Structures are given as C-alpha cells and as structure tokens.
Regions:
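Short, glycine-/small-residue-rich phosphate/pyrophosphate-handling segment
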Residues: 1-14, 18, 22-27, 175-178
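Accessory alpha-helical/coil subdomains and C-terminal extensions
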Residues: 13-99, 104-106, 184-191
Length: 191
C-alpha cells in the first residue's frame, strides 16, 4: 500500500513478492523463487505516440488473434516457417540474434517471410538477448530481414511484443496500420 501512496507510473504494473515492476519491462526469469519477475533494462528507441486511437483503447473488445513465436536457431529452415505461416497465423514474432540478425543468406527463408507479409501477416523481430534491441541497420543481415517485411520490435520484451500484437491485430487493424502503431511507443513498452 505504501507504493500506491507514492504514486505509480502510467500503464500496467506487476506486483509480486513485495516488488513493483513496470509491466511492459517485466519478464519472468525464475520458476522456483519468489523474486521470479524482473524489469529488463532497455534503451528508449521509439517516438511516443501523440494520441491513441479509440479502437486501440483497452476497454474495446478484441477479436481472437493467432500468433506464433519462433526463435532463430542454427538449422532453421524455410519449410519450418512455411508450415507455421501456412497454418493461419496472423502475426509472427521472430526472436533474432543480437541486434536483429538471422539466416539472411537463406533466400528461400526470406521469400517465405516476404510472401507471408504480402498475405497480410504481421512480422516483427525482437532480440533473443535479455538486454538487447533490434536495430536492423547494424548489420547487412538485419537489413535483409527488414526488406523481407519484418518490423523492428526495438527493445521490447517478448511479453510486451506479443501483448502489443494482440492489441493491434485484435482491434481489427490491417497489417500496414498495425506496423505503424507497432513502431510507436504506446504505453512505455519501447521506453
């Protein structure tokens, strides 16, 4: 209760085992300890949205959304992504190496991503590093992923990126609008 008396930051907060954590930065690191949740440090990498449109208000009903998360790993093949993206997935969160790199020399894999984006699938990239950020311009490999249709999740955690994808796609936004709003900081998720 003392925390509430001091005032809170805007947005969602997680209170667990006497610790208050900013919801958009929270991730669970431990499964067998009471201090299971931490706020991962990330740098600010996005412009704050001037206003949130009514259709994105949290009180608005949402449609169910079919999402998938795929970590990039040695041996990831185009056929893996083709099977997943052909299953009706509306959004794919690709967990890239470091600052947003992956198997960018695999032309078949890049074509699968490009075709999914053209079909209206929202493709986003975050870093596998707990304290990482996707900056596609860092390496040529990142530029190729961006050219295939991925949008940078910047320094968002997996939890924040998935929540944002559900909010945007569940509101019925088309993929272009969803990409535009995904790139903006709406509630501290990219701060």
């Amino acid at each position: 209760l003392r925390l509430f008396e001091q005032g809170l930051e805007d947005g969602v907060q997680l209170y667990f085992h006497g610790q208050l954590v900013h919801g958009c930065r929270a991730t669970k690191l431990r499964s067998e300890a009471f201090d299971a949740f931490v706020a991962l440090p990330r740098h600010r990498d996005s412009q704050r949205a001037a206003a949130i449109p009514a259709e994105l208000d949290y009180r608005q009903p949402r449609q169910p959304v079919n999402l998938a998360v795929v970590p990039v790993f040695p041996g990831l093949q185009a056929s893996h992504l083709q099977a997943l993206l052909g299953s009706g997935v509306q959004g794919l969160l690709l967990e890239c190496y470091g600052s947003g790199t992956g198997p960018s020399d695999d032309l078949a894999l890049l074509e699968v991503l490009r075709a999914a984006r053209q079909r209206g699938v929202l493709l986003a990239a975050i870093s596998q590093c707990p304290e990482g950020s996707v900056v596609f311009d860092t390496y040529a490999a990142g530029n190729r992923l961006r050219s295939a249709g991925l949008v940078s999740g910047g320094g968002m955690t997996r939890e924040a990126a998935l929540g944002k994808m559900v909010a945007l796609l569940g509101a019925g936004l088309d993929v272009e609008s969803a990409e535009r709003w995904f790139a903006l900081d709406l509630c501290g998720e990219r701060a």
